[in-house]
């Protein structure tokens, strides 16, 4: 009996690990926002140009991660430059780049990250069935070879903190060195974004459903 209970506990623990983190929970009803929404008028004069640039390209404007980043204006400036490369100038095709981002959105159950990048991934050509399988917690079916590499590298790096020689050389053959490095770079950067969003308990825009229902 005890062995059966132990095996059941282990199985549940493994299952919990495999489906990733629990959904990022919204603030308690009536609780003040951890980081009140920053306005353009509150941003220092020497960061105004940066803020205007962000408003032009961000689907959430100064909300989401930027609301938190601007608490450290120099960091916001450096991060914006990094995101400019990783979003718009990376060697990875946009389809694969956005796939890598929503993988981290799924792993962190990041409400804003998934809300913002799921439609971008589909627009870039990622099959909806692949994105929906990912969100359901299963290995996506019918992935192309390059999508498989993006998924496997991202998952192994997140969950094992390394990748096997076999996967490394497979990824290098399919993506090439630059795309492989850019893949890991965008993945790590969007872990940072997810952590910032979790720090501030940032959610989907008001009136929009949460991609990951709070538990």
Report the location of each language-model feature.
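Bacterial N-terminal signal peptides that target proteins for export
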Residues: 1-10
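Short, linear, compositionally biased motifs with a strong N-terminal bias
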Residues: 11-15
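Hydrophobic alpha-helical segments
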Residues: 22-215
